[in-house]
Amino acid sequence: MGKYKPPAERKYGRGVQVCRRCGSRDSVIQKYGLYLCRQCFREVAYEMGFKKTR
């Protein structure tokens, strides 16, 4: 096997935040300390007390 360099450990940026529910790294909502991706947020938002106004 050839040389392999593991990816650098990130300290900040989009790849650091992880969804608490599914582990996804893209489109994570950090506001209010949620740390949920937008798909998981849509599934559990009503149970958490968020309500649609429109």
Curated annotation (Swiss-Prot):
**Domain of life of the source:** Archaea
> What is the name of the gene encoding this protein?
rps14
Listed under subunit, the entry gives: Part of the 30S ribosomal subunit.
Q: What does this protein do?
A: Binds 16S rRNA, required for the assembly of 30S particles.
Q: Which UniProt keywords apply?
A: Metal-binding, Ribonucleoprotein, Ribosomal protein, RNA-binding, rRNA-binding, Zinc
PROSITE patterns noted in UniProt: RIBOSOMAL_S14
Q: Which GO terms describe its biological process?
A: cytoplasmic translation
Instruction: Enumerate the residues binding Zn(2+).
Output: 19, 22, 37, 40
Instruction: State the Pfam families in the record.
Output: Ribosomal_S14 (PF00253)
Annotated protein name in UniProt = Small ribosomal subunit protein uS14
Metal-binding found in the keyword field: yes
Any Gene Ontology CC annotation: cytosolic small ribosomal subunit
Q: Which cofactor does it need?
A: Zn(2+)
A single GO molecular function term of this UniProt record: structural constituent of ribosome
Q: How is the cofactor bound?
A: Binds 1 zinc ion per subunit.
**Family per UniProt?**
Belongs to the universal ribosomal protein uS14 family. Zinc-binding uS14 subfamily.
